Amino acid sequence: MVKWLYQLFIELTNHAWTSKCLASFTRSKWSRLFISSYAKVYKINKEEMEKKLHEYETLQQLFVRTLKKGLRPIDTHPDSVVSPVDAVIEDVGIITDQKEIIVKGKTYSIREMLGDDQIAEKYLHGTFIILYLSPSHYHRIHSPICGEVVKQWELGGKSYPVNRLGLKYGKAPLSKNYRRITELYTNGMYTAIVKVGAMFVNSIELTHEHDHVKKGEEIGYFSFGSTVVLLFEKDVFTLDEQIVPPFEVKMGQRIGFLAQKKKSQ
């Protein structure tokens, strides 16, 4: 019953015009009146922001704010994988024989998430990591590894919330929400970065246009709280032993290691 009511509420309120109205408002000069209260409610760390709070002219500018230089050092170990975002690692697990992952008791299809069965096949029995960004988090997305950009594509339409309620009661938000996907190739290994849009504000902007990315390099940003899903192939990723979900991480912080060479299957 709770699940049905939750989904009904989302369906009644989550329409294209709702998203457009909200996006338009957050970019308007009137939204500036809400910046101070927004920062207070979500406990935004003003000491980290590149600008003073009063210098942001719209809520949108605050959402996509940059940070002071040097506040997010990138782990320097050559084989490390770093967090692409400031977030909470909500779940880590293994992709099943059916190309599925289980998050908060809900099953998600990797094939549906990626929109391509051949691409999904690469990640069979690999590792997935779910990173949730709240509205208070720094919203810019960075590359977790160095690599060649193989492909970038987008899927999905309207979006359910991607917080804990959304993951539990929503209609498979990780595989149905609007999402933009980047696949990287490093030393014979593939990694997928799935950027999942949040309810009402589907905006995911890409800021990297080159064929190669460095670890920690900015690749895009969300316009509101959202989620990143990382997918690794079988036997190529080892989780850092200190990470036990739910676990708060900062962008650039080491979350694990990539194998130096992919094992032969």
Curated annotation (Swiss-Prot):
Active site, renumbered: 86, 142, 226
Site (Cleavage (non-hydrolytic)): 225-226
Subcellular location: Cell membrane
Catalytic activity from the UniProt record: a 1,2-diacyl-sn-glycero-3-phospho-L-serine + H(+) = a 1,2-diacyl-sn-glycero-3-phosphoethanolamine + CO2
Enzyme class, first EC level, given as a word: lyase
Keywords recorded for this protein, A-Z: Cell membrane, Decarboxylase, Lipid biosynthesis, Lipid metabolism, Lyase, Membrane, Phospholipid biosynthesis, Phospholipid metabolism, Pyruvate, Zymogen
Record-listed Pyruvic acid (Ser) modification sites: 226
Pathway: Phospholipid metabolism; phosphatidylethanolamine biosynthesis; phosphatidylethanolamine from CDP-diacylglycerol: step 2/2
Post-translational modification: Is synthesized initially as an inactive proenzyme. Formation of the active enzyme involves a self-maturation process in which the active site pyruvoyl group is generated from an internal serine residue via an autocatalytic post-translational modification. Two non-identical subunits are generated from the proenzyme in this reaction, and the pyruvate is formed at the N-terminus of the alpha chain, which is derived from the carboxyl end of the proenzyme.
GO biological process, one term: phosphatidylethanolamine biosynthetic process
Pfam families per UniProt: PS_Dcarbxylase
Cofactor: pyruvate
Source species, domain of life: Bacteria
Protein family according to the UniProt entry: Belongs to the phosphatidylserine decarboxylase family. PSD-B subfamily. Prokaryotic type I sub-subfamily.
UniProt function note: Catalyzes the formation of phosphatidylethanolamine (PtdEtn) from phosphatidylserine (PtdSer).
UniProt-recorded name of the protein: Phosphatidylserine decarboxylase proenzyme
Lineage per the UniProt record: Bacteria, Bacillati, Bacillota, Bacilli, Bacillales
GN (gene name): psd
